[in-house]
Each structure stands twice: as C-alpha cells, then as structure tokens.
Amino acid sequence: VYADMCSSVLSNAVDRGVAKLVTLSALYGQSTRNLEKQLPAGIGAAGVIRSIRRYLSYRSLLEKLQEKMQEANLRNYLGRPLPVDKQRLLVSHYLQSSVAEASMVMFSDFCLNEPTAVPLFVIHDALIVDCEKELADRLLNEKILFLDFDNAKFPVKVSALRNNYNS
C-alpha cells in the first residue's frame, strides 16, 4: 500500500516511511499542522491528504460505513460485526479489522500450502513460523512473498529472525 502511495500519489517525492505516515494520517485523521512538521519542504499536508483520500475513495467508503452504522449493520470486509459508536472511528476500525482478518486468512492459507511451516506467533500483521531449511532458504531467497486474498495479491516481506539450522 505505502509503496503504491509513493509512486501513484506522491510521485516518488518521499520514501516509503513518509508515505506510510501520510497515508495513515489521511485515513485516521492526524491534524495537518502536526503532519506538516514531518513532511519534506515543498509538500503540503492538506493537499497530500486530499490526494490520498481521493485515490483511496475515502469519502465513498465513509458514506457506505455511515449508512451501515445507521442500519445497525456495520461489518468489516469479511462480515464480522463492528461495534463502533463514533463516526470519526468508522474508517479506521473498518480498515484495521478487515486487514487483521484478511491477514489471518492469508496466513492460514500459507500454512496449509506449506505443511513444513509451523506457525509460532502472529503479531499484528506478522506471521512467525518454524520451518525446514529448504523452505527457509526458498523464502529468504525470494525476499518477497505474494499472498492471495479476494482476487488480489499482497506483497509480504520475508526475513529471518534467527538461523537455527546447520548449513
């Protein structure tokens, strides 16, 4: 998402870290005054937030969520009920809940497709597995793994916490 924001919205004027900050600010409502202090010179916070919200169809999503909230039928993308009582939290709760559950589905699919990968921990959007050397070597060689969800591919960074096997 953030790499896409870098190129598609921010014309590669900032690195991924700044793109992440701006994207999260646009979605979760950080003040432009605070954001302005963290942006490189020449990049206006208000304009960037508007551009990102437009690119992500933020207003359309917010309107749909407000409608569902009024109907008492607010659910995340996968259908889990969302108990949100403040409109300013609609988008952030919807996105966080949806992404967390989609991650679980993708992690589960990965483990089913890679039977030697034994899940140890899930920490936010990270899956920590114990696996055989061959799988570890293949994953580390690829560096990025693409997991599928709802006809979309999501890039996942692969890294090793510790090498406990002998070469």
Language-model regions, residue ranges each:
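Conserved catalytic core of nucleotide polymerization and phosphodiester-bond processing enzymes
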Residues: 1-167
